[in-house]
A protein has these predicted regions:
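PLP-dependent aminotransferase class I/II
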Residues: 1-140
């Protein structure tokens, strides 16, 4: 998908071997004139199983973090000497995280996906991207 206008792929560090369990990317809504959810729907119509959105809330919104709940009674990590108990996180601390969680396009990925499958998926994504680039804001 490198070089496909409007497709923003995950960053990959040189020399790092990835073990994908999901494949994700975002789109430039200005290029396609549609939302990520609409792009995901168009992919699904092509038989490409992408959804839009990851988890509903950032990790710091969950009770395990907010209420410092732990498994058992250890209190770890909040009882460790280096813990900083006064730290609290809010949506204002992570606006990019909030945006990303609702805009990322995601497909489950596993060891059963072959190189041929990956090429077929890329071909379908390119097809949808090309259509919306030529017909921005249109409904597929």
């Amino acid at each position: 998908l490198a070089g496909v206008p409007g497709i923003i792929r995950p960053f990959r560090y040189d020399g790092v071997v990835h073990s994908w369990w999901i494949y994700s990317f975002t789109i430039d809504e200005g290029v396609f004139g549609i939302s990520p959810r609409e792009f995901a729907s168009a992919l699904q119509a092509e038989g490409i199983p992408f959804g839009c959105g990851y988890i509903p809330n950032p990790m710091f919104d969950y009770p395990v973090i907010q209420e410092r709940k732990t498994y058992g009674t250890s209190g770890i990590p909040w009882t460790l000497p280096q813990a900083r108990p006064g730290i609290r996180y809010s949506d204002d601390d992570a606006p990019n995280t909030i945006w990303f969680l609702s805009h990322v396009l995601i497909m489950s990925w596993n060891e059963g996906i072959t190189e041929s499958d990956a090429m077929d998926l890329a071909k379908g994504i390119k097809k949808v991207a090309a259509w919306f680039k030529e017909n921005p804001g249109s409904k597929a």
